């Protein structure tokens, strides 16, 4: 705020009987102009994002939705919209308090976390993208919990496990890695911490490695359950 505001200058002037300045007598202090603020938001992309998100929320009968578009090269936010939305220039007449859901709401990220588990596998040196993983008969038991895919994918590569979103393959990979391998990749990606945009109301979600000694907890984290993130955190993690 101080950078944008600037500072007023001062000078002594001579005025005529009508109050008009007729001469500058002394310049006490030159004014300091405030700095410019350039937004990363692209108004065209913001409009398209708003239109498409509203259509998707209505089309799926959802109660709410958020969309954030990030430049993968710079990390700049190009578009950020929520539904339901509101016009800040008009009266607000909504039953539910209006908030910026991209930074205030958190949820289980689900299968969007599987690529991070694959990254942990690649970093371990035990896996390559073409490493084969057996998923037959389409399910397996981890202690008392059954993990299953919608269909039996048989033997697939690590890359195919991401493409086909296989719970079984990803869970088996997680159990084959060191206990905190997946957690460490997620933590390095920024989960569990503030993104630092300065947007008011930002929360960090719930993210901890407590309970990672449990095989069930390790597999759940590998495919995006047992912890929560904000849409902003998830988008930033992919950059």
Residue ranges and their predicted role:
Residues 1-66, 86-89, 93-97:
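Extracytoplasmic/periplasmic proteins that interact with beta-lactams or build/remodel peptidoglycan
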């Amino acid at each position: 705020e101080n950078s944008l505001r600037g500072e007023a200058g001062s000078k002594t002037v001579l005025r005529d009987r009508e109050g008009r300045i007729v001469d500058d007598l002394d310049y006490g202090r030159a004014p300091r102009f405030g700095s410019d603020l350039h937004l990363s938001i692209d108004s065209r992309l913001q409009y398209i994002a708003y239109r498409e998100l509203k259509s998707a929320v209505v089309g799926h009968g959802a109660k709410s939705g958020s969309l954030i578009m990030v430049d993968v090269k710079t990390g700049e936010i190009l578009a950020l919209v929520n539904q339901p939305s509101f016009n800040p220039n008009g009266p607000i007449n909504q039953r539910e308090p209006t908030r910026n859901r991209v930074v205030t709401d958190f949820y289980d990220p689900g299968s969007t976390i599987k690529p991070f588990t694959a990254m942990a596998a690649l970093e371990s040196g035990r896996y390559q993208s073409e490493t084969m993983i057996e998923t037959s008969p389409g399910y397996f038991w981890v202690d008392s919990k059954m993990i299953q895919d919608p269909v039996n994918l048989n033997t697939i590569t690590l890359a195919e496990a991401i493409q086909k979103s296989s719970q079984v393959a990803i869970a088996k990979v997680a159990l084959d890695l060191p206990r905190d391998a997946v957690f460490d990749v997620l933590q390095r990606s920024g989960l569990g911490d503030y993104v630092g945009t300065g947007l008011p109301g930002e929360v960090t979600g719930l993210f901890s490695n407590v309970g990672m000694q449990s095989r069930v907890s390790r597999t759940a984290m590998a495919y995006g359950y047992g912890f929560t993130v904000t849409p902003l955190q998830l988008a930033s993690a992919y950059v």
